[in-house]
């Protein structure tokens, strides 16, 4: 099998890991710690003796904001050319600050420009803090990023609470706000449960894959060693058998020189005077130079398939092979009855001590005409082995990729945003 064919599945596994590594997660942004903000809101409605108070526990300080307490009156931007301005992104954004107010807090809606622009514009008008409410009702506050905004405090709250406060401001009702530092939340790259899940799953997957590969290669090594030993012993047995066969030189008047006599079945040529021939136990005659190499590999008569090892009593009932390095699939084609007979003969032999191939599921050696596996068949067998190994690698890579994506999915609640 070519190196390119073996590298194909391996490249797929590498591509899967590369895709996983480039998966768009928020792990880099989510590694920052953040502080929660505890916000108390006091609403002084006209004609009502007791002010209305409520608390916002889900506020969050900006990443670049000072983590400090602040108190002030809440103000929203003035309309621009008669159009309400809740975003604070327009260069003409203005705030009406009553003369008797020393500290005030700007209330702005998220969107349309960066947090830095909103906060800087409010700071330009001397706000001590900026409260930005989300622009999506189902989203929790995020950690805002706004470098270079100075000492102004920036906090984000939910859309629901922000619009509640805005509704009072639109009615010209005074709203006071106190912002206090809440809990420091450490970086959260992986939830504990996700980390345990990824670790255990990956370890189990690697153990199973490694055990399978180790078992596979051990069996392959055992098979190869047994095959080589049997091949050497078969070769020795064939040489011993050949040495016991009768040879003679064809002389004038011998029956082999008769034109009607069979030609040599190996080279398909007639016998001539002074040719050295080999006589097999089945009485078939061949050129010695032709049949000896054949017998070394096949150990059977080229014509009647007689087993010369068995006929000479060297290895009784031993099936011969022209190539012991056969592929596994061709071995499984013959019947189980012949396999048991062949392996029984191998185990019962005492002259050479040949051992059967220690590979489960191997059937007997096929007939000589089918023994030599074609190049395409060998390539298919080897390709299948590499495909199985590469499949385990690809499966491991995809599983690990899935587990990492699943674990990082819990990071959304800790994201850092710029606008």
Swiss-Prot record:
Top-level class of the enzyme under EC nomenclature: transferase
Signal peptide positions on this chain: 1-27
Pfam family membership, one: PA
Compartments where located: Membrane; Cytoplasm
Glycan-carrying positions: 29, 40, 112, 135, 172, 189
PANTHER family on file: RING FINGER PROTEIN 130 (PTHR45931:SF21), SI:CH211-59O9.10 (PTHR45931)
Listed name of the protein: E3 ubiquitin-protein ligase RNF130
Organism from which the protein derives: Mus musculus
Gene that specifies this protein: Rnf130
